[in-house]
Amino acid sequence: MTTYSCASWTIALGGDGALSLSRGGQSLKTRLVAIKNGVSPRNTQQQMFDLRLTERAGDSAELLDVRPEAERLTVRTALGEGFELEYILAPNGPLLEMTAVLRYDGEEPQRLRFLEWTVEGAEEKDYPRMELFGPGTMPCVDEPIDLHRRLDRWQSDNIISHIATSAAPYNSSGVMGCYDAERRAVQATWFLSDFFACATDGLYRRGRLTRVSRITCPRMMRRGDEETIGRFVFLLDGCARDAAVRQVAESFKTAGWDKENDEKALRAINLLEVFVGEKSNRTLIDTFDELADKMEELRDMGFNAVEIMPAFPWPSYSVVDFQNVPATYRDTDGLRRLIERAHECGLKVVFDMVFHGPRDFIDPRLNAIRSPLLDAHPDWFARTEHGTFAKTYTRSFDLSNPDYQRYIADSMIYYLDEWRADGFRLDAQDWNFFPNWDETTGRMPYEMLLAGYRMMENIRARVLKEHPHAFFYTEARAPGAGNGHEYRYNYDYHWLYPSLCRVVDPRGMAPMVHNYGSENTMSWADAALWCAENAAIQPRGVVTMQQVDSHDSAEWSGYVGGQFNREAFGGACYEVLFTLAALLGGGMMALYTSYEGHEAYVSAVLKLRLNAPVFRYGDCRHTALSADDRKTACLFWTHEGDAAMFVGNLADEGKTVTVRLERGAYPADVSVRLRDMISGDALGDFAAGALEEGVMLHLEPFEKHIFDLERI
């Protein structure tokens, strides 16, 4: 085995072409294998993953050349069958960044599908010291959730198989590894790209902790072709867990996703999402005129923005023509009255834009019309490798098509000019997560994969030239969401609710976020840690729109009528979860009527978000306040000299708990009166230092309080 030193890293080259990476007494072993040819048997959203009869190149690679340089090491290997892979490794302190350059010199064209990326880390003998490390990665598994459980105590051999098709870094962070809690050492890996996505098949407890991921890079490879794919990032460091999170955050910053936006101004939004008509056999409201009559009431509840979705049941999420408002919203007179009334009441109006495509059939029961885009612009749609149009339940737009992107920008400007829109909620930006194999486009097939996010930089810039007040809200929910958006969804948080609380609906809950093995097993301390780490790696200037219910989550269950979370968890628990979401430090969204029966409490919380300076302008400290109970949620907020804290019982049982404030989180030499900011009742007077020692509270089932620390 040949060994090279590169800054603080040692890189060894094995006879099979794998790379061994070492630093500070820790090591990782990694390799890339090219997956090619085969067939995608189904024309569905799973085209990128449901592949059959594929071939592999690189399981046993041959070393061709090594070029050591001062700041990097270049390793060239032959994968076989005409493929050559060059690794470019550049150390940056505890981080090692790797770029891969794939070349082809064979005779016959090859259809590249993806690179299989394997990383072997901690050895089995070290599992008793190791816990999972993955800020922003959702540990939503079918067994009890404990972020500090040692690796030898997990039952699942594949710890994270549930996120196999998440498109990191857009729909999960993709950070995976382990932390040695005894020796304070971390090893982790992730992948950064605006073109290629990392989809992880598993994190396996084999002889070593082994990550197996797919770097999706579909294209045809012909003689003389090459493709540069990166960046692969490796972290080996001896440090505390929070310091390791900061290393990850600094790495994500280099991707250029940060924005110079005023986050505190952006998060002062309470958005109401609403659809008119029937969806999932449930009708929230029948007409736009009825909704217009509700605007004053909704404003008085504390909402300051309304998101208007296409008409249901048709066209629903089938695109007809963005600029054909009668076809998309049906009742244009009612829509105009709604917008006018919303603005009169001081509410911003957000239009929902759906990007995946139109249905290519007509259902006479829905009085449906065929989208003119299907015939007028066939080049706007993706093709499968078989030459047919790609589709899920709609024919799939190719979001990398420049003409289609111009149409999107034109449509946004039209809504801003003619319909007085204030912003846009962007749906299904990665729903069409597969390549466009149409070789007449002049674009690479992989350019379609993440184009829905990448395109927003240019679209946003064009729209803001004419309408600088406009804002954009993406369904993505991870660091890559910083591309062209002020707001992002919180779908990376929804798994927390059933992990923290018991599901009481006898029907159960949506399996997308719910596992019976993990239901009600997570402690608030772990949840707070996960929230803090997830928030730390998000791009600056992008605000997470927190929510308990959305139109999507309401239908995930597949039940007739859908399922609101007040139905899943019960009304009392719902109020605790709503408060948590509202005070996690982002914007807030609610689905119309999802809060039915709880309007007064929801209104009180929404108004606090907008009117209390500590929440409007302050900072959320997820882990600064804690309780000696697994099921007591705590949050701490500060702003200048003000402070507030939330304490909520997540369980259907009364309890007495001791709540403690982290030392240094608030001046210990002042006295405060804890006053409930909703009821106005005072709990008592305390020296702030006493909060560090602990204050006892008795909480009835699902009792919750938002306390102001009123200086006396």
PLM region descriptions:
Residues 688-712:
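C-terminal beta-strand-rich structural cap/linker in extracellular carbohydrate-active enzymes
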Residues 162-174, 178-182, 624-666, 708:
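Carbohydrate-binding surface patches
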Residues 30, 35, 39-40, 44, ...:
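Polysaccharide-binding surfaces and accessory modules of carbohydrate-active proteins
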Residues 2-76:
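Acidic-aromatic substrate-binding/catalytic surfaces of carbohydrate-active enzymes
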Residues 270-272, 306-308, 349-351, 424, ...:
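Hydrophobic faces of well-ordered beta-strands that scaffold small-molecule active sites
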Residues 96, 121, 141, 150, ...:
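N-terminal structural segment of carbohydrate-active enzymes
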Residues 460-461, 467-597, 610, 620, ...:
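Conserved alpha/beta catalytic core and glycan-binding cleft of carbohydrate-active enzymes
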Residues 258-259, 265-289, 296, 301-304, ...:
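Substrate-binding/active-site clefts of carbohydrate-active enzymes
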